[in-house]
């Protein structure tokens, strides 16, 4: 056993030094500009590692790059890797890889087997990935699977309040309460299915999914959260928040993200979401923002005991999405110069954008200041004590790096909106460190990438501490955002698209009398948010996918006329 471990260490040692190459890339992209080369390097990293996954882990939901083997999370595959990564391959124009993925989805993927899935994760990764793939290809295979999956997921919303249960059984459609946290659902998870469900309704003309998603938001808003800040748990039986913990990290993050993105998805026509978003931003500024010592890094803390309690200086890497979100909210997807020329530009938007830049710089420092890898840990704790010399500390249990996307996501937004090359430089530094310290090359010279268990030290052989796991969001989000960061052709224009929280781009669209928000905010205790009446749907006979040849608007009008008749 000891000999086997020693030999494995020797192999990994050789692999690591082959992969690191002194921090430089081995690819030859002569004749390209600096950022064209950077984009080509990202593309090569994606394709090299994807081909290795195709060879050793094809179809499996989980991939172990060092063992070179995969496994499924349940009795059958969910498409975790393939579906989540598909639109990245489409955006990069990889027809052969896309064709193989399509064949697998058509022939091997099925969402009707007996297995409990997380409602949120399955929605943002699988449903989101299928819908984005359909948008880029107009291939019914993807929409058919999306409808099949949505039919399986809809039972999660059959709670007394309309707040989805944390899990659902794909075969029975029965929603399942969380086994911990007293059965509560995560607030972020409940409020981060709306883009996907609404877009599916828009594509199919079926309002069921739209109404399920909107009902969640109406229930959450009826709690009238103070200053727009919400606890991270909500009870699916009552629709009331549970506990007092407020944070923009895990279980809280994407609630705030989807307030803005629902507003943008429907071309800024649903002001209720802009109002909720603006209120939450002011709440964040008032209660959660602070600065570190000695460098004055702006960070977002947590309120363990709710508003009025002491601010914890802990910040998840997950929070790093917020800098880009603030910048996107300030400009609406226009460049900063374009937005500043409008009459709607004001001190509020200026302050939002500035805060977004400051937070993104802090997140960059969470990489840059970490030795020896230059990679961010999962969580840091910022210092406000003037007697200490470091801006943040990393606790032993928080030293891992899962190759998360949030920092490069914000760098992508800020570069697109400002054109400031410093954001590309920051992103390229992070990319280089990912290549140097997470790249694994097997004896055949085949490339993979692995998460790390510790970014602050190497093992006894001087090697990175690999977790032997590749997350699907490495391809779906992190490398996609890096690819787009270095893109000079404005792929996926921010004025035309909104990215879901798993980086799947959806096109913006207009509302109409059929597809629109059917409730209004609760102004006072005596006025209840009103849900509009809608066609009663027989949930025992849900629709098969019927991709529309005509526009969804025309389809909706015909349905309305049918109901009225």
Curated annotation (Swiss-Prot):
Pathway: Protein modification; protein glycosylation
Keywords, comma-separated and alphabetical: Calcium, Disulfide bond, Glycosidase, Hydrolase, Metal-binding
Gene Ontology MF annotations: calcium ion binding; mannosyl-oligosaccharide 1,2-alpha-mannosidase activity
Positions annotated to bind Ca(2+): 501
A single cellular component GO annotation: membrane
EC main group: hydrolase
Active site, UniProt feature: 378
Family named by the database record: Belongs to the glycosyl hydrolase 47 family.
Cofactor: Ca(2+)
Catalytic activity: N(4)-(alpha-D-Man-(1->2)-alpha-D-Man-(1->2)-alpha-D-Man-(1->3)-[alpha-D-Man-(1->2)-alpha-D-Man-(1->3)-[alpha-D-Man-(1->2)-alpha-D-Man-(1->6)]-alpha-D-Man-(1->6)]-beta-D-Man-(1->4)-beta-D-GlcNAc-(1->4)-beta-D-GlcNAc)-L-asparaginyl-[protein] (N-glucan mannose isomer 9A1,2,3B1,2,3) + 4 H2O = N(4)-(alpha-D-Man-(1->3)-[alpha-D-Man-(1->3)-[alpha-D-Man-(1->6)]-alpha-D-Man-(1->6)]-beta-D-Man-(1->4)-beta-D-GlcNAc-(1->4)-beta-D-GlcNAc)-L-asparaginyl-[protein] (N-glucan mannose isomer 5A1,2) + 4 beta-D-mannose; N(4)-(alpha-D-Man-(1->2)-alpha-D-Man-(1->2)-alpha-D-Man-(1->3)-[alpha-D-Man-(1->3)-[alpha-D-Man-(1->2)-alpha-D-Man-(1->6)]-alpha-D-Man-(1->6)]-beta-D-Man-(1->4)-beta-D-GlcNAc-(1->4)-beta-D-GlcNAc)-L-asparaginyl-[protein] (N-glucan mannose isomer 8A1,2,3B1,3) + 3 H2O = N(4)-(alpha-D-Man-(1->3)-[alpha-D-Man-(1->3)-[alpha-D-Man-(1->6)]-alpha-D-Man-(1->6)]-beta-D-Man-(1->4)-beta-D-GlcNAc-(1->4)-beta-D-GlcNAc)-L-asparaginyl-[protein] (N-glucan mannose isomer 5A1,2) + 3 beta-D-mannose
Any GO BP: protein glycosylation
Positions with biased composition (Basic and acidic residues): 526-538, 550-565
Protein name: Mannosyl-oligosaccharide 1,2-alpha-mannosidase
Disulfide bonds: 320-363
Top-level taxonomic group: Eukaryota
Pfam family, one: Glyco_hydro_47
Biological role: Involved in the maturation of Asn-linked oligosaccharides. Trim a single alpha-1,2-linked mannose residue from Man(9)GlcNAc(2) to produce Man(8)GlcNAc(2).
Species for this entry: Candida albicans (Yeast)
EC nos: 3.2.1.113
Region ranges (Disordered): 526-565
């Amino acid at each position: 056993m000891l000999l086997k471990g020693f030999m494995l260490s020797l192999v990994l040692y050789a692999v690591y030094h082959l992969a690191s190459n002194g921090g430089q890339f081995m690819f030859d992209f002569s004749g390209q500009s600096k950022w064209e080369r950077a984009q080509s390097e990202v593309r090569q990293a994606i394709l090299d590692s994807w081909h290795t996954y195709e060879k050793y882990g094809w179809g499996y939901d989980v991939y172990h790059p060092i063992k070179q083997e995969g496994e499924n999370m349940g009795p059958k595959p969910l498409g975790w890797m393939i579906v989540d990564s598909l639109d990245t391959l489409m955006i990069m124009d990889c027809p052969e890889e896309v064709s193989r993925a399509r064949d697998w989805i058509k022939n091997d993927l099925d969402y009707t087997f007996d297995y409990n899935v997380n409602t949120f994760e399955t929605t943002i990764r699988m449903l989101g990935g299928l819908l984005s793939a359909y948008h880029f290809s107009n291939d019914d295979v993807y929409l058919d699977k999306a409808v099949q999956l949505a039919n399986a997921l809809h039972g999660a919303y059959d709670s007394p309040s309309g707040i989805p249960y944390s899990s659902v059984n794909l075969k029975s459609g029965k929603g399942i309460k969380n086994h911990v946290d007293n059965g509560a659902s995560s607030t972020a998870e409940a409020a981060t299915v709306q883009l996907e469900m609404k877009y599916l309704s828009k594509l199919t003309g079926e309002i069921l999914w739209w109404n399920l998603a909107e009902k969640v938001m109406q229930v959450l808003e009826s709690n009238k959260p103070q200053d727009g800040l919400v606890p991270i748990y909500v009870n699916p039986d009552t629709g009331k928040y549970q506990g007092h913990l407020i944070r923009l990290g895990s279980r809280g993050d994407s609630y705030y993200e989807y307030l803005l993105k629902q507003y943008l998805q429907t071309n800024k026509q649903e002001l209720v979401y802009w109002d909720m978003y603006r209120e939450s931003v002011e709440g964040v500024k008032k209660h959660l923002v602070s600065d570190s010592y000695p460098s004055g890094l702006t960070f977002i803390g947590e309120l363990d005991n709710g508003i009025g309690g002491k601010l914890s200086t802990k910040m998840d890497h997950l929070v790093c999405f917020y800098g880009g979100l603030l910048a996107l909210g300030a400009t609406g997807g226009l460049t900063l110069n374009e937005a500043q020329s409008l009459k709607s530009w004001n001190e509020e938007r200026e302050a939002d954008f500035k805060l977004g830049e400051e937070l993104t710089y802090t997140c960059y420092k969470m990489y840059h200041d970490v030795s020896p890898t230059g990679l961010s840990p999962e969580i840091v704790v910022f210092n406000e004590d003037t007697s200490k010399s470091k801006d943040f500390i990393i606790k032993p249990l928080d030293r891992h790096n899962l190759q998360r996307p949030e920092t490069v996501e914000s760098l992508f937004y800020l570069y697109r909106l400002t054109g400031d090359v410093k954001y590309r430089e920051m992103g390229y530094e992070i990319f280089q460190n990912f290549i140097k310290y997470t790249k694994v090359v097997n004896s055949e010279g085949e490339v993979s990438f692995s998460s790390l268990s510790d970014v602050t030290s190497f093992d006894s052989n001087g090697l990175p501490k690999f977790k032997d796991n590749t997350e699907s969001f490495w391809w779906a989000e992190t490398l996609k955002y890096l690819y787009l960061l270095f893109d000079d052709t404005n792929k996926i224009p921010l004025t035309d698209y909104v990215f879901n929280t798993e980086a799947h781009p959806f096109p913006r669209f207009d509302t109409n009398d059929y597809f629109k928000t059917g409730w209004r905010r609760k102004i006072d205790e005596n006025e209840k948010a009103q849900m509009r009446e809608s066609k009663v749907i027989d949930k025992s006979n849900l629709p098969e996918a019927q991709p529309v040849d005509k526009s969804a608007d025309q389809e909706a009008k015909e349905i309305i006329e049918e109901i009225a008749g």
